[in-house]
């Protein structure tokens, strides 16, 4: 593992004073007219590409950092990059894979990608508090990318690094239901759910029922930690950057609210 993310240098301030839309994947997206995003710079993550069933536009930047999700969706992510050369896919070089006994091992993502593509960029990722990334929003991603409690935090971190001055969140519902049909294993988490999950039914927590549909592997969400990370980011934002929650049905109150469609009336 290299010590610096030199490949990220070319993205620093690449979108100085521009606006970006960060698409989290909550079911509230189904209540929004996302055709407005045609021609906009949109960040996406995980299985967010399922939105392409409904819209012609594509994400400009795409991310997956969760150790369980990245390997469960690795073929899909590679195909996304292969089919969409104008989309840049950002992935961690390696991740800590949590096992049922509570122990973890390091597994390389980079080595399991079928072949190198120009639009796949790998980075080193470190936990909050590591001196290479700091308290929750690293402003020099060459040093390291913050290991988040939600991939949406990673997207905000990259948006700040790229120089965007207006960052609009959509689909950040920050609300989950885990029913009895979900298979649980591993250690018990603070919200009363075990850490390692496998779905057996349709997914009620995202905009597409197949997102974490039958057989999909995921980690138990910890909304308290998610919100705490969002709040850390808010405190660390540069003064010239405005982050606004333009979604609906969202329990994320760390950022100011704004109306999605009114953004396009400017």
Could you tell me what each predicted segment is?
Residues 1-266:
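Metal-ion/cofactor- or nucleotide/acyl-coenzyme-handling active-site neighborhoods
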């Amino acid at each position: 593992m290299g010590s610096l993310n030199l490949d990220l240098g070319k993205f620093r301030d690449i979108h100085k004073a521009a606006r970006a839309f960060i698409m989290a994947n909550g079911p509230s997206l189904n209540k929004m007219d996302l055709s407005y995003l045609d021609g906009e710079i949109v960040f996406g993550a995980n299985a967010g590409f399922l939105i392409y069933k409904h819209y012609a536009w594509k994400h400009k930047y795409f991310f997956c950092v969760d150790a369980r999700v990245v390997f469960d969706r690795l073929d899909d992510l590679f195909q996304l990059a292969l089919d969409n050369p104008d989309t840049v896919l950002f992935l961690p070089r390696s991740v800590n894979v949590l096992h049922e006994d509570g122990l973890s091992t390091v597994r390389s993502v980079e080595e399991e990608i079928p072949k190198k593509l120009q639009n796949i960029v790998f980075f080193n990722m470190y936990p909050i508090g590591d001196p290479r990334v700091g308290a929750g929003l690293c402003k020099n991603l060459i040093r390291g990318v913050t290991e988040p409690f939600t991939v949406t935090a990673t997207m905000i971190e990259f948006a700040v690094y790229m120089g965007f001055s207006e960052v609009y969140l959509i689909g950040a519902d920050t609300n989950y239901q885990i029913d009895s049909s979900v298979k649980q294993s591993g250690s018990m988490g603070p919200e009363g759910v075990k850490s390692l999950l496998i779905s057996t039914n349709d997914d009620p927590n995202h905009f597409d029922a197949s997102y974490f549909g039958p057989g999909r592997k995921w980690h138990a969400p910890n909304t308290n930690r998610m919100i705490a990370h969002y709040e850390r980011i808010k405190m660390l934002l540069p003064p010239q950057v405005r982050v606004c929650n333009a979604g609906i049905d969202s329990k994320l109150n760390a950022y100011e609210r704004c109306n999605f469609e009114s953004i396009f009336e400017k």
